[in-house]
């Protein structure tokens, strides 16, 4: 009887103990949820002007005019930067870490507002465009590709109803992503694990290229997107980049010579200032900072 009694006592307390443990997990989840909502409810410092216009189409001409920018106070990251990018031109920005390359790209999508100067897209100050509308026409390809849990196709469409399966497949063929996807057991319905853990860095980058092309942006931004690619997909990525350079304005930050040498213009930055610009061959002939 004593053995049976202790056996029943154990069966009684085990569910209670499990419930107590789950309660701790629930409390942690509620606390995490509150922090997430706090972040989501942060109001953006950037707001549309009352007369901001919605964009139907961009040609892709970009101009920086005497731009000064600092993240904090007057610790200037960009100092009196001026340059012009023609529509459908391919321009690369090179320079040491901290020279302002990525900052320039962030300002074009208006992640921040500048302190001095002006930034124009298609001849109009970017502050006169609706922020969401502007970003809709700019495709970004970054070093760290974020893939969501879901199918390959949903990661390319980003749940947009305007992008059909045919558009997805066409975009994948264009950027050579189909050569990777067609080898998958379920092809476009293959499940992507969290953050794309079941794909190599190069494969994730090809999927991000297809994502951008399928949304048909007028301006494309490539920020160190070729820095961590694997050797197996490097040739596919370089070939897809050459194709993408012909469909819109492209701005590139990269350290790989193979990525930037075919650009129409290369802008060299040093400590927030433009020190020289030209084509790859022109800059080599100058034997300046780019040559070194």
Segments predicted by a language model, with ranges:
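Conserved E/DxxT/N motif and adjacent residues on the DHp alpha2 helix
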Residues: 38, 45, 157
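Membrane-water interface of transmembrane alpha-helices in multipass transporters/channels
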Residues: 1-7
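Signal-transduction coiled-coil helices of two-component systems
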Residues: 26, 43-46
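Short, conserved catalytic or interaction motifs in soluble domains
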Residues: 14, 28-31, 41, 131, ...
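ABC-type nucleotide-binding domain
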Residues: 48, 55-292
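Conserved catalytic core of two-component sensor histidine kinases
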Residues: 6, 13, 135
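Cytosolic ends of transmembrane helices, especially the final helix of ABC transmembrane type-1 domains
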Residues: 11-39
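Generic alpha-helical structural context detector
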Residues: 4, 21, 34-38, 169-173, ...
């Amino acid at each position: 009887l004593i053995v049976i009694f202790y056996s029943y006592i154990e069966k009684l307390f085990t569910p209670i103990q499990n419930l107590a443990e789950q309660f701790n997990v629930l409390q942690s989840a509620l606390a995490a949820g509150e922090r997430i909502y706090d972040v989501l409810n942060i109001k953006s410092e950037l707001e549309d002007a009352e007369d901001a216009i919605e964009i139907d189409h961009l040609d892709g001409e970009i101009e920086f005019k005497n731009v000064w920018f600092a993240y904090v106070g007057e610790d200037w990251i960009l100092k009196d930067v001026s340059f012009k990018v023609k529509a459908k031109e391919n321009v690369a920005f090179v320079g040491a870490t901290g020279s302002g390359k990525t900052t320039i790209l962030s300002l074009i999508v208006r992640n921040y507002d500048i302190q001095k100067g002006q930034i124009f897209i298609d001849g109009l100050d970017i502050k006169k465009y609706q922020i969401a509308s502007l970003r809709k026409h700019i495709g970004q390809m970054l070093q760290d590709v974020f893939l969501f849990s879901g199918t390959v196709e949903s990661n390319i469409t980003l749940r947009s109803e305007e992008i059909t399966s045919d558009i997805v497949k066409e975009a994948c063929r264009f950027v050579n992503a189909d050569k990777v996807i067609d080898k998958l057991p379920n092809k476009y319905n293959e499940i992507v694990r969290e953050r794309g853990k079941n794909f190599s860095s190069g494969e994730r980058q090809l999927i991000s290229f297809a994502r951008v092309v399928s949304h048909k942006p007028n301006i494309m931004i490539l920020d160190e997107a070729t820095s961590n690619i694997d050797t197996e997909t490097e040739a596919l990525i370089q070939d897809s980049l050459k194709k993408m350079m012909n469909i819109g304005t492209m701005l590139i930050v990269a350290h790989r010579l193979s990525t930037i040498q075919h650009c129409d213009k290369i802008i060299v930055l040093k400590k927030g200032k433009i020190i020289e610009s030209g084509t790859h061959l022109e800059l080599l002939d100058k034997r300046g900072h780019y040559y070194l």
